[in-house]
Amino acid sequence: DRIMRLRERFGSDRIIALLGNHDEWVVNGSSTISNNSVYARIEEWEDESDDDEYINWLSSLPLYYVEGNTIFVHAGIDEEAGDMWEWETSEDVFTSKYPAETGKIEGLDMKVVAGHVGTAEISGDKFFHDIYFDGESHYYIDGTVLDSGVIPVLMVDTENDKYYQVTDSGKQLIEPYEE
């Protein structure tokens, strides 16, 4: 609801929302807003009377967004497709790709920013819930918020190819994750 209102207030060109796997389940009818574990934790969505409004809104969300040399996506892209990723990636990969991939994407000079898989799992550190950068092509931003209470905030300067983690104390350039 908040994201919908933010888009109404500031415009869909400034507030970008992407379709994710839970949203896709609601749109295709395999789940409802009130019984979907992500939405069920939000009291205001326990009333199914507004479901049509949310379903229509979710149906309008794009699968990815590109700004500069950065692809923003819920889960990932078909990396074997290289620079043909936009045409070769299936909808289920955009929304449900698993496991997360790391390393250089051959044939594609772009970065991918994705969520879906928790950074604790990607890093192999159950206590890591910050932004994960593999040092090559991937930034993962799923801090497993329902377990950790952490919502990592990423600021991207696409003109200068700089990626920052934003916290209450300011912004910090993201360095590759080190074990």
Where are these regions (language model features)?
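Active-site neighborhood of divalent metal-dependent phosphoester bond hydrolases
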Residues: D1-G68, E79, S96-G103
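The start of beta-strands in P-loop NTPase/AAA+ ATPase cores
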Residues: I15-I16, N69, K111, S137
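Short catalytic/ligand-binding loop motif for oxyanion handling, primarily in non-cytosolic enzymes
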Residues: E24-N28, V73-A75, E79-G82, E121-S123, ...
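Short, surface-exposed, charged loop/turn segments at secondary-structure junctions
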Residues: S31-N36, G76-F94, F128-H129
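Short, well-ordered beta-strand micro-motif
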Residues: V66, F72-H74, V153-D157
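Active-site-proximal beta-strand elements of phosphoester/diester hydrolases
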Residues: T70-G76, Y139-I141
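Acidic, His/Gly-rich catalytic cores of divalent-metal-dependent hydrolytic chemistry
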Residues: T102-E179
